[in-house]
From Swiss-Prot:
Keyword Acetylation attached: no
Gene Ontology MF term list: DNA-binding transcription factor activity; protein dimerization activity; transcription cis-regulatory region binding
Protein name: Transcription factor IBH1-like 1
Primary role: Functions redundandly with IBH1/BHLH158 in a regulation node known as the incoherent feed-forward loop (FFL). Acts as transcriptional repressor that negatively regulates cell and organ elongation in response to gibberellin (GA) and brassinosteroid (BR) signaling.
Keywords associated with the record: Brassinosteroid signaling pathway, DNA-binding, Gibberellin signaling pathway, Growth regulation, Nucleus, Transcription, Transcription regulation
Compartments reported by the entry: Nucleus
Main location class: nucleus
GO cellular component: nucleus
InterPro entries: bHLH_AtIBH1-like (IPR044549), HLH_DNA-bd_sf (IPR036638), IBH1-like (IPR044660)
Family: Belongs to the bHLH protein family.
PANTHER family linked to this entry: TRANSCRIPTION FACTOR IBH1-LIKE 1
Organism expressing this protein natively: Arabidopsis thaliana
Record gene name: IBL1
Residue ranges of every copy of the bHLH domain listed in the record: 110-160
Reported consequences of knocking out the gene: No visible phenotype.
Length: 180
């Protein structure tokens, strides 16, 4: 799924608003601080496109709200910023390591046929790749449902593609201006 031009336009508007909010504080800062401000405003703009309807957008809003609460409140002013910032994400459930180790030992003791071994390898591979997705998508580590994780990942990819398209068009426009 490709991002629509209206998504690109809305992202650009929200990103510009975030950069304008940061503008007074950016002028006398280091390159690292400017980079951080650009990334922070882009993340908030991307999350505000989804208006907190997805887990990854709420996770980004929560993360950026701790870094720069003023920016988040300004950029989310039209979509109930207080409820999104204060909305708690579900807590991750944690297993006891001893129990997990004990159950793994019991499983190893049982003999497996070749097909069972292949199925177990495939399960481990899927689990490893799913964990990789959980680490990439904001808030992914809190999602226990794999189908929801895939839906959120696809939505996050579309939003990242929107961000890349807008940034690429800005760079192209700047390069065209320099060539003149």
């Amino acid at each position: 799924m490709q991002p629509t031009s209206s998504m690109n336009e809305e992202f650009l508007k929200k990103w510009q608003m975030g950069l304008q909010i940061f503008r007074p504080s950016i002028d006398n800062t280091s390159v690292h601080e400017r980079k951080k401000a650009i990334k922070l405003s882009a993340d908030v703009a991307m999350a505000s496109l989804r208006k907190g309807t997805t887990c990854w957008s709420r996770a980004l809003i929560e993360k950026t709200a701790t870094e720069d609460n003023f920016l988040v409140r300004q950029m989310l002013s039209g979509i109930k910023a207080e409820t999104l910032i204060n909305k708690k994400l579900p807590k991750k459930t944690v297993c006891h390591r001893k129990i997990v180790r004990r159950s793994k030992k019991i499983l190893r003791r049982k003999s497996k046929s070749a097909s069972e071994e292949a199925a177990a390898k495939a399960k481990r591979l899927v689990k490893r790749r799913t964990q990789g997705l959980r680490n990439v998508v904001p808030g992914g580590e809190l999602m226990s449902n794999d189908v929801l994780l895939l839906q959120e990942t696809l939505d996050y990819i579309v939003s990242l593609q929107t961000q890349v398209n807008v940034m690429r068009s800005i760079v192209d426009a700047a390069e065209a201006e320099i060539e003149r």
